[in-house]
Amino acid sequence: MNDNNDNNNNNKNIDNVDDDNDDNDKGKYKGNEFSILEKSLNKLLNNVETFKNYNNQMIESNNKTVDFVHSRFNK
């Protein structure tokens, strides 16, 4: 008995799965969702650019330190 009920529940779950070809979904994701995604991606891109700039500054600073140390010990 329980196995049959479980099968019926599983079938109901499968029937409720939303497929992407459903005409009722047309236009559903216009506007706000893409706007939020675009803002998030732009923020992520800005964070990547900030990190790249910081990383380049650290490399430049390290190179200056290496140059200084070499100039002190290579006399």
UniProtKB/Swiss-Prot annotation:
Bias kind Low complexity: ranges: 1-14
Stretch list, region Disordered: 1-30
This protein's name: Uncharacterized protein DDB_G0267542
